[in-house]
């Protein structure tokens, strides 16, 4: 049996609470994230983002004939990686997405599933790039756009030849393989998905395939009134997920906790970091923080650039912290 959680931290807490309720020693079930499960079924390795940027840069320079340096390409490359990932996670048709459609007849033939308003919007967008006397910026945009599909295809082929892939590519390949009727080498008789929320198209279709094979069960973390409020956009996923992937067992209702929120206005990032020090110091002075209280205490930053100032603001009394946040290669 395997349990699939949104992230590894959730899995660690699950193991902690499982050990507390177990009367006797037991072997822990396999704990995975949904990314781990996709990678396991694909047989591919998750490609390193930095190496992918260099690979993408080499292909881009060769296909476009551009003389951009890697530094100049970096921002553009990051955006392309994100776009390619979204294309595959949402199972979009990349060839059609990157089509350079300017003729209304061509739009009507290739995009007959669109409404008249959508066709008009697409035509309006592309027609703006074909006035008499194209500007250099328009020409550059069109030149880049025309190589995007070939860039996407060669980039994926290069990664596949190395036995690697980015998340969306791996997700898509696993789903398409299962939908063709191929049976992945599943080492688990039962897979329980816990606490997932906003699912991409590839994730939905993956869960549907496992559900069809009767090896998946689903449990959703929808306790908050705001999440279940039909007037709140967040509730869209609640009804959709519960209807498509119901739980096989009914769990007892969780006790709702009343949240207390205090808003403190501080204009600068450094000021926010200093106030974190003040708050943590006060909590440590009031009573020695137990290990359980420490586990339930989190500092959530709105900006990754605040990470270093906040780390420097941690009081000396707090000896151990767990940082789960990325930091940019350049600031």
Where are these regions (language model features)?
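Nucleic acid-machinery interaction/catalytic patches
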Residues: 1-331
């Amino acid at each position: 049996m395997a349990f699939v959680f949104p992230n590894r931290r959730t899995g660690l807490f699950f193991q902690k609470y499982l050990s507390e309720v177990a009367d006797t020693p037991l072997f822990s079930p396999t704990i995975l994230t949904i990314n781990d499960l996709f990678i396991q079924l694909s047989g591919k390795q998750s490609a390193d983002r930095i190496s992918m940027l260099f690979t993408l840069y080499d292909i881009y320079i060769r296909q476009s004939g551009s003389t951009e340096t890697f530094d100049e390409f970096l921002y553009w490359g990051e955006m392309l990686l994100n776009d390619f990932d979204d294309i595959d996670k949402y199972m979009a048709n990349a060839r059609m997405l990157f089509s350079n459609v300017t003729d209304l007849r061509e739009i009507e033939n290739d995009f007959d599933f669109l409404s008249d308003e959508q066709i008009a919007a697409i035509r309006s967008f592309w027609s703006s790039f074909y006035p008499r006397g194209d500007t250099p910026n328009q020409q550059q945009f069109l030149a880049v756009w025309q190589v995007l599909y070939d860039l996407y295809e060669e980039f994926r082929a290069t990664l596949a030849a190395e036995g690697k892939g980015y998340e969306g590519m791996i997700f898509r390949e696993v789903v398409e393989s299962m939908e063709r009727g191929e049976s992945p080498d599943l080492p688990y008789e039962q897979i329980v998905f816990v606490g997932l929320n906003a699912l991409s198209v590839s994730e939905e279709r993956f869960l549907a395939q496992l559900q069809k094979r009767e090896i998946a069960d689903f449990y959703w973390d929808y306790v908050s009134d705001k999440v279940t409020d039909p007037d709140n956009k967040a509730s869209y996923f609640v009804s959709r997920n519960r209807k498509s992937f119901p739980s096989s067992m009914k769990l007892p209702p969780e006790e709702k906790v009343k949240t207390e929120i205090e808003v403190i206005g501080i204009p600068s990032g450094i000021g926010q970091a200093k106030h974190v020090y003040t708050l943590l110091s006060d909590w440590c002075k009031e009573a020695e923080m137990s290990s359980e209280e420490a586990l339930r205490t989190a500092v959530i930053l709105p900006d990754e650039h605040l990470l270093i100032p906040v780390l420097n603001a941690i009081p000396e009394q707090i000896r151990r912290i767990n940082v789960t946040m990325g930091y940019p290669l350049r600031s």
